[in-house]
Amino acid sequence: MCRERDPQEDPASPEAGVLQVLDRQLAVGGQLVTFATAAAVYEDAFVPLHGEYQAHNALLALAAAEAVHGGRRLPARIVEDGFASVTSPGRLEVLRSSPTVLVDAGHNPHGIEALTGAIEEAFGFQHLVAVLGVMADKDAEGVLAGLEPVTDAVVCVPIDSPRAMDVDDLGEIAQEVYGADRVVVSQQLDEGVAQAVA
């Protein structure tokens, strides 16, 4: 459901002229979000992605779509259909269940903060193991420090890139953050994933 904005609304009021995520509720497979744009309020739009950051990304996409259409309110059906087809490969993407395997391309402490918040909000994991490879120019210690509070262990794996951090170097950093008993170093990605889900 959506309503058009009253042009007489005070532009300084929370209801007028700004982009806002007014409400978010967990839903199976994503979240129900109420968006406010300069043109309308869109209530309970289903966004099939997890995390507060994805609600804000969806809000920006919605505002861009309104701008393309002359700044007008979009029909509710268009908004529903548009969000229903949204995917975000590599961002808190569920690859399989039983056990659940997620993939996320977060590569800095800020991205990991968004990831861990979304994991805690959307999933009730009793046991969580991170499988991690890092580029050499990234803040590996900061990424590991962000993951450590929400994971039981970390499996360090190589990345197939000339820019990748050596997996043994990553393992040493991980041991400083997690302690040696919570770190596994695997020389192959597939073996590392198998160790994590075992």
Regions found by a protein language model. Name each.
Residues 1, 8-10, 28-34, 100-102, ...:
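C-terminal helical cap/extension that packs against the catalytic core
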Residues 1-26, 47-51, 78-85, 93, ...:
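Beta-strand->loop->alpha-helix junctions that form or flank phosphate-binding loops
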Residues 33-153:
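Nucleotide phosphate-binding/pyrophosphate-handling subdomain across enzymes
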